[in-house]
């Protein structure tokens, strides 16, 4: 007699049992799949930015405006012409006449003259003529006048146009995963909708023994875990699971489910029924409606994994045990999906880094400083994410932040170890650090991956060169290939765009004044000075009318159709580490092609 519970199925199907003849390394298995079914992006969908959360940008995004779009107050107080306050002190305050006020959301309806002041709030637009803001705590109001007890310099407590981002500046590369910081930056520049990729994954759990969680569990049955764990993991990564549910161990039912899946989704994932036993039907089903490319991998867990193609869509047959299925999804399916959308790396919590420059905290306050990280292969090095404390877009692209305690009086010094709390995984495929020009923008636009950009000026480029940080560096002080960039003047007028002290353009500002016939004394008395971080920002500010004149590069001027006047030639050196040779040569050739 046959024991109760046994079946003759094993005997009748014994001839169908398959033996794994070739166990491939995972990399080789995926190479075969990707050669047969390249991981190309799905059709893009346009969605409101609030619905884009978690998905992947399907195209590069540029800023349509300068940010800030107009001069704004960074403090509550009074807008003034800075020179009107010079000489002010606690003992001898300067008296100014209050001629109006500008509230947040209002457009100034008057021009500020010397000896005058206008009350402003944090975020208010500055009236024409104003170039600084005296904080309210340094002012005493006396009727229609104020007494100023502390002098200010041009630009103090002012957010100038394009100091965060300039019109046309690349913000995010396609393939960037949309998170709350990306949405904040998009809203900051007025973008309402974006095109995203949302790859759909069809999930099929196979096994006559599987029961939906929540239902009574009979002897011989187990709960279906894979349907729930895998769809959750896919959602965590920004992919869209379509759940078919449980299919019994029946070849025809499995075939039907797979054929339905390739019609509804971009990728099909099955779990269970992939081994070599007589009741393992997935590879047989795929073989009948498509092609089995790989069956059996040389890693654990994952030996019975099957990779195939049906009607041009990839089919992943994963092991049925929940731990194995999850591991297989993580190691095989998710990397394939990330390639489809050119995804960013996943996040970490914190890491140690070396301060690449000094970081100064606010006295008596715990200070969080956004940073970008580069590596020499063994250590991370922390750079400031921006020159400005009010740069939302730059902040949103930071890798993380360091915390300077409120009790610390001394700055964080270069070379000091810091703890970086991460917004995301700081790993990168490519990075460009130091000085910049539109030649760099042109190269970035051609790349099919999002490089890490640190346009922080000459010091950062020289530091990356000195420390051999994995990157392409650009600086007049670095080691590398020499290129010449033509420095030019654009526009004329009393509102002057000044390069940041970290920029390679800054040493040429004296030449700009000489050619324009402006003395240092006149500059102090007559001109409004607006500091900008890059040649592109300076040119953009002139093109948009935010400043009247500026020093920039010929490339930046011509990119915006500006007339320019020659000033001088700047020498820059472009170098790179070996792993950045291809990107470095592309940047170098773009500078040479543009010829200054």
PLM regions: where:
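Periplasmic-binding protein-like
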Residues: 480, 484, 561-589
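N-terminal segment of the mature folded domain
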Residues: 438-492, 575
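Flexible glycine/proline-rich
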Residues: 23, 27-30, 40, 45-50, ...
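Short helix-initiation/N-cap motifs at beta->coil->alpha
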Residues: 436, 448-461, 524-540
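Helix-rich terminal scaffold detector
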Residues: 2-27, 192-318, 322-328, 332
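Short loop->beta-strand "edge-of-pocket" segments that line small-molecule binding or catalytic clefts
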Residues: 432-434, 490-513
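A ligand-binding cleft/hinge motif common to bilobed small-molecule-binding domains
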Residues: 460-472, 540-565
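Short, glycine/charged-enriched hinge/interface segments at domain edges or termini
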Residues: 14, 20-26, 79-245, 259, ...
């Amino acid at each position: 007699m046959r024991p109760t519970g046994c079946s003759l199925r094993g005997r009748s199907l014994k001839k169908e049992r398959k033996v794994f003849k070739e166990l491939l390394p995972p990399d080789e298995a995926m190479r075969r799949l990707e050669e047969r079914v390249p991981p190309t992006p799905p059709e893009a969908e346009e969605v409101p930015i609030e619905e884009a959360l978690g998905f992947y940008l399907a195209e590069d995004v540029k800023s349509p405006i300068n940010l800030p779009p107009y001069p704004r107050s960074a403090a509550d107080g009074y807008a003034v012409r800075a020179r009107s306050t010079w000489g002010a002190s606690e003992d001898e305050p300067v008296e100014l006449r209050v001629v109006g006020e500008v509230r947040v959301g209002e457009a100034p309806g008057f021009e500020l003259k010397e000896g005058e002041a206008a009350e402003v709030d944090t975020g208010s637009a500055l009236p024409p003529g104003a170039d600084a803001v005296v904080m309210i705590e340094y002012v005493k109001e006396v009727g229609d006048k104020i007494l100023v007890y502390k002098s200010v310099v041009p630009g103090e407590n002012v957010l100038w146009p394009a100091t965060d981002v300039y019109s046309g500046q690349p913000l995010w590369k396609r393939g960037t995963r949309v998170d709350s910081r990306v949405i904040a930056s998009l809203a900051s520049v007025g973008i309402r909708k974006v095109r995203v990729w949302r790859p759909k994954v069809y999930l099929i759990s196979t096994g006559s023994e599987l029961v939906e969680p929540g239902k009574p569990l009979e002897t011989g049955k187990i709960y279906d875990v894979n349907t729930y764990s895998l769809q959750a993991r896919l959602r965590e990564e920004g992919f869209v699971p379509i759940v078919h549910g449980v299919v019994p161990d029946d070849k025809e039912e499995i075939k039907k489910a797979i054929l339905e899946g390739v019609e509804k989704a971009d990728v099909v994932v099955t779990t269970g029924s992939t081994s070599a036993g007589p009741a393992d039907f997935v590879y047989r089903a795929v073989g009948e409606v498509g092609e089995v490319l790989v069956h059996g991998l040389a890693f654990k867990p994952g030996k019975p994994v099957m990779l195939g193609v049906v009607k041009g869509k990839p089919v992943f047959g994963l092991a049925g045990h929940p731990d194995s299925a999850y591991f297989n999804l993580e190691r095989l399916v998710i990397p394939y999906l990330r390639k489809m959308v050119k995804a960013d790396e996943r996040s970490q919590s914190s890491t140690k880094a070396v301060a690449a420059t000094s970081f100064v905290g606010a006295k008596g306050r715990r200070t969080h400083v956004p940073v970008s990280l580069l590596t020499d292969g063994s250590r991370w090095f922390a750079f400031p994410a921006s020159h400005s404390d009010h740069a939302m877009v730059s902040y949103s692209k930071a890798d993380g932040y360091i915390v300077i305690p409120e009790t610390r009086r001394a700055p964080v010094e270069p070379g000091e170890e810091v703890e970086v709390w991460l917004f995301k995984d700081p790993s990168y495929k490519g990075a460009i650090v130091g000085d910049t020009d539109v030649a760099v923008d042109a190269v970035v636009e051609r790349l099919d991956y999002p490089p890490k950009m640190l346009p922080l000026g000459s010091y950062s480029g020289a530091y990356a060169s000195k420390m051999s940080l994995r990157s392409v560096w650009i600086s007049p002080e670095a080691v590398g290939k020499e290129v010449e960039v033509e420095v030019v003047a654009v526009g004329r007028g009393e509102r002057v765009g000044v390069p940041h002290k970290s920029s390679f353009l800054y040493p040429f500002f004296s030449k700009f004044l000489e050619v324009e016939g402006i003395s240092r004394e006149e500059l102090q008395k007559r001109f409004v000075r607006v500091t900008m971080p890059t040649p592109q920002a300076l040119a953009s500010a002139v093109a948009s009318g935010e400043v009247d004149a500026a020093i920039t590069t010929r490339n930046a001027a011509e990119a915006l159709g500006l007339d320019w006047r020659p000033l001088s030639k700047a020498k820059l050196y472009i170098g790179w580490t070996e792993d950045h040779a291809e990107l470095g040569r592309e940047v170098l050739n773009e500078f040479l092609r543009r010829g200054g």
